[in-house]
Every structure is written in C-alpha cells, then in structure tokens.
Amino acid sequence: MPAASQYLRALEARGLLTCRRVGRRVNYGPTTGTSEGAAGEIVKALRVSFRKAQPIDAIFKLATAFTHPRRIDVYRNVAIGADSFAKLQMTTRIPARALSRHLGKLEARGLVKNEIARYVAATPRHPFARVLASLARR
C-alpha cells in the first residue's frame, strides 16, 4: 500500500479525516469538526488557520514542532517550570547538543521563549499552535 494511503488511513482513524468510497476511488476530506477530544480541537483550529493568508507554510511549521517525542517532553518540562538549561537537561536526560536543537525548534515556532538564561512556555498567537501546545501539556 502506498505511503500516502497509509497516512490518510491513520488520519481517518484518529478522527481528522472522513473517507467516502466513490466507485473504485476513496475520497478523503476534513471532518465536520464536531468530533470530540483532541481530533475535534485540531480540526477546529485548522479550519480557522485556513482562513488566513499563507496557511500551509504556517501549519507545516507548527505541525513539525511536536514531531519528535523528546521535543514534546522538553515542552512539557518547560511548561511545568523546568526553566534553566541545566534543569531541563537533568529532567529530560537529553544530551546538551540535542536539547539545544529541540529548544531552538520550539523557540523558532513561538512555543518557548528564552528570557535571560531561563526558558518559559510562550502563549502562541496562532490557533493551531495553541491547540498543539495544549495537547502537548496533557
């Protein structure tokens, strides 16, 4: 099975897409946004995001913020108060170079701020970023 089909099925299984068979083809589309839980929150935020200019670039950049499990762990620890680089390294057990790289990606996406040698969770302005940050904290 092609990778695209597998990804579409995975998104459907999580409630982000619906599929409909039309003859030999299967058409995928966004859900109505009425689903509950994380999928519903994500779909609603994406609908708002697509109304803005240049949505694809912004959504792609934000979606890649939490594509690595360690980055989610780093974000969670920053959100609960592990504010210094040393504290983050101790609580996450991530090597310094990798931790620095993960923090850089989170900073570039507006999810974490570095304020004079301490890290704090930022309040994202983008609706999709807010939903992702909320889900990462869970």
Model segments located where?
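Amphipathic alpha-helical dimerization/coiled-coil segments
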Residues: A13, T32-G81, P127-R138
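Short, Lys/Arg-rich nucleic-acid/phosphate-binding segment
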Residues: R21-N27, G33, E115-R125
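C-terminal regulatory/effector modules of DNA-binding transcriptional regulators
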Residues: E107, K113-N114, Y119, P124, ...
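Short amphipathic alpha-helical interaction segments
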Residues: M1-E12, R93-A108
